[in-house]
A protein has these predicted regions:
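N-lobe entry segment of adenylate-forming
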Residues: 1-97, 101-104, 108-114, 195-200, ...
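Conserved AMP-binding/adenylate-forming core of the ANL superfamily
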Residues: 18-23, 71, 85-139, 156-161, ...
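Conserved pre-ATP/AMP-binding loop-to-beta segment of ANL
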Residues: 81-83, 206, 218-238, 245, ...
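Conserved AMP-binding loop of ANL adenylate-forming enzymes
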Residues: 122, 126, 268-281
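Generic beta-strand/beta-sheet core signal
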Residues: 127, 151, 175, 207, ...
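Structural core segment of the AMP-binding/adenylate-forming
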Residues: 143-215
Length: 281
């Protein structure tokens, strides 16, 4: 479909996938602009220039002037025809979370964040498991234009603080318990240690209080969507810390919108209605 799109709109022809890949490498600006067009990326503010090269390379700018929202591109696919999330942990049955339930939970968590004064550019953390309520917490954070970062609950407090303390976070989401290998672990003491050790954290919200999902009649447009600049951070990851303190790895919002659309469709051939699983911490 993408190759046909390039033929129809750009008069480009490729004999095979390798030729397409080589074109994308040799013509980066044209390639990434075509991704925005093929996937109909919604820019709240249009871009001025696609690509502004610079030396050193990390000062290169993409889609200058553009504003957009990652959360918007998630919720624009909402449909009652299929679930948003299918979830199971070691101690639960399989549950399906509808798009309406995800919208309602995201809205509820976003209202809490707004009450706590979280605004665009603030950092919100999560020390918890991969779960539907964690997804909703991320979407609530992202929709406000705030920055997300997270650590797995099996991390020790020192490892977490080494990472999170670099970010001057305002709010910490956390799960008090998690199950692994047939055992349930209580980390409430670790949560308090982290919160007390990082002075910037003003409030801790326990995701254990948000395990239930309902079909509250919340419309998508009731979730506040705050567009951010293309290169504004969406989340902060960290290196392993094996050669010194963990180093922050910042991903841009627009970069992740484009990369996820491109990677899931062109590399992994994920199509509408299919189910996708990514094994990760």
């Amino acid at each position: 479909e993408y190759i046909s799109f390039l033929a129809d709109t750009k008069s480009l022809a490729f004999k095979d996938y390798d030729a397409l890949h080589q074109w994308s490498v040799d013509n980066q600006a044209a390639f990434w602009e075509s991704i925005t067009q093929f996937f109909k990326v919604d820019f709240d503010t249009p871009y001025e220039e696609v690509y502004v090269p610079a030396t050193p390379f990390w000062k290169t700018k993409w889609f200058t002037g553009a504003q957009l929202s990652y959360a918007h591109h998630v919720f624009r696919n909402a449909t009652p025809a299929q679930p948003a999330i299918i979830y199971q942990n070691e101690t639960s049955e399989v549950v399906e979370i509808s798009w309406q339930q995800l919208i309602a939970k995201t809205h509820a968590l976003q209202q809490q964040l707004k009450t706590l004064g979280v605004v665009k550019g603030d950092v919100v953390l999560c020390y918890g498991i991969n779960s539907p309520e964690t997804v909703a917490a991320f979407l609530a954070t992202n929709a406000l234009g705030a920055v997300w970062s997270s650590c797995s609950p099996d991390f020790g407090t020192d490892a977490v603080c080494e990472r999170f303390a670099q970010l001057s976070p305002k709010v910490l989401f956390a799960h008090q318990q998690y199950a692994y290998g047939g055992k349930v672990y209580d980390i409430s003491t670790k949560i308090k240690t982290i919160s007390d050790s990082i002075g910037a954290i003003q409030n801790t919200l326990l995701l254990d209080d948000h395990l239930s999902f309902d079909d509250a009649p919340v419309a998508i447009n009731q979730i506040h969507i705050e567009p951010v600049s293309f290169s504004d951070p969406i989340w902060v990851l960290f290196s392993s810390g094996t050669t010194g303190k963990p180093k922050a790895i910042v991903h841009g919002t627009g970069h992740m919108v484009l990369e996820h659309l491109k990677a899931l469709a062109l590399h992994q051939d994920v199509r509408k209605g299919e189910r996708y699983f990514w094994y990760s911490t």
